[in-house]
Amino acid sequence: MDGIKYAVFTDKSIRLLGKNQYTSNVESGSTRTEIKHWVELFFGVKVIAMNSHRLPGKGRRMGPIMGQTMHYRRMIITLQPGYSIPPLRKKRT
């Protein structure tokens, strides 16, 4: 399982960094428990809470045919005080 796809940097997610909460998009079929264990093992941190929501796909037009992109899941991970995750940066091309 890949776990986290990439970190999300929006106005809200940057504001949540001050509360030791990290926002990222994760695999759509993964559960909270899987992501929690993956984050704790990979980053060596203690997770105290996780909030998740599924964002809908967007409509995309391909000529006369209207298509739909895949939905995705976003997790807000709250860590215990004293722990932090280095920023997950997406490679710019």
From Swiss-Prot:
Please provide an example of a Pfam family that matches this protein in its UniProt record.
Answer: Ribosomal_L23
UniProt gene name: rpl23-A
Which cysteine pairs are covalently linked by disulfides here? none
Q: Which PROSITE patterns match?
A: RIBOSOMAL_L23 (PS00050)
**Superkingdom of this protein's organism:** Eukaryota
Record organism: Daucus carota
Q: Does this UniProt record's set of keywords contain Metal-binding? A: no
Q: Which GO terms describe its cellular component?
A: chloroplast; ribonucleoprotein complex; ribosome
Q: Name one GO molecular function term.
A: rRNA binding
Q: Which UniProt keywords apply?
A: Chloroplast, Plastid, Ribonucleoprotein, Ribosomal protein, RNA-binding, rRNA-binding
Task: Work out whether the entry's keyword set contains Ribonucleoprotein.
Answer: yes
**An annotated GO BP:** translation
Q: Give the signal peptide range.
A: none
Q: Where, by residue number, does the polypeptide cross the bilayer?
A: none
The name on file for this protein is Large ribosomal subunit protein uL23cz/uL23cy
Where located? Plastid, Chloroplast
